[in-house]
């Protein structure tokens, strides 16, 4: 079992999944992972399935050189509304999310309350091939695989704030207090 970059705060309420040397583009996978970070598990799976069907888009923020502008990307705060639909990256992330979900079921966690707390994509070792060019030359033909790690945390439901019986007093600055006193003194002197 490999090491994770960080460990969850409460291991009993979390589940992990990781994949190493995955034959999928690093840059596309990194952008896809950032798009689902912080989402609930069910919402992330639905979103990634929509990406595969091109109903929703992945905004490209860091690795956006040469990425075309799409109307769907306007919904995100993306500079230049750049985005793509990285199908293979979405499929790999769906597999990892399903793996994490089954790990959560083994640990008896509530899968409806799982949130993606940590997801990280690292570069893996390049796979080297060659392509043959004109005049007897040979050029490298490299692939950029990646490692993916994630953990999901079971979030507790937010407790609503209790209402106070006493109304809290508004804080008033010194300048406003002086103005109020001056007004009171002037209006009191007129009577």
UniProtKB/Swiss-Prot annotation:
Give me the Gene Ontology terms describing cellular component. cytosolic large ribosomal subunit
What protein am I looking at? Large ribosomal subunit protein uL22
Keyword set, alphabetical order: Ribonucleoprotein, Ribosomal protein
Q: Which family does it belong to?
A: Belongs to the universal ribosomal protein uL22 family.
> Can you cite a GO biological process for this protein?
cytoplasmic translation
> Which residue ranges are recorded for the region named Disordered?
159-191
Q: Which gene encodes it?
A: RPL17
Residue ranges with Basic and acidic residues bias: 159-168
- Gene3D superfamilies documented for this protein: Ribosomal protein L22/L17
Renumbered to this chain, the Basic residues biased-composition regions fall at 169-182
Tell me the SUPFAM superfamilies matching this sequence: Ribosomal protein L22
Mind listing the GO molecular function terms for this protein? Answer: structural constituent of ribosome
Q: Which organism is it from?
A: Suberites domuncula (Sponge)
- A Pfam match: Ribosomal_L22
């Amino acid at each position: 079992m490999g090491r994770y970059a960080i460990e969850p705060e409460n291991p009993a309420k979390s589940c992990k999944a990781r994949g190493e040397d995955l034959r999928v583009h690093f840059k596309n996978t990194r952008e896809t992972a950032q798009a689902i970070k912080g989402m609930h598990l069910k919402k992330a799976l639905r979103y990634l399935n929509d990406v595969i069907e091109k109903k929703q888009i992945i905004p490209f923020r860091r690795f956006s050189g040469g990425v075309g502008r799409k109307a769907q990307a306007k919904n995100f705060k993306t500079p230049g509304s750049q985005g793509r639909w990285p199908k293979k990256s979405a499929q790999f992330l769906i597999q990892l999310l399903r793996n994490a979900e089954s790990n959560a079921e083994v640990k008896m966690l509530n899968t409806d309350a799982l949130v993606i707390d940590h997801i990280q994509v690292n570069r893996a070792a390049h796979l080297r091939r060659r392509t043959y060019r004109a005049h007897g030359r040979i050029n490298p033909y490299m692939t950029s695989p990646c490692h993916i790690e994630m953990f999901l945390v079971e979030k507790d439901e937010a407790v609503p704030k209790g209402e106070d019986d006493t109304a809290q007093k508004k804080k008033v600055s010194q300048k406003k207090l002086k103005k109020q006193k001056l007004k009171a003194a002037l209006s009191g002197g007129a009577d």
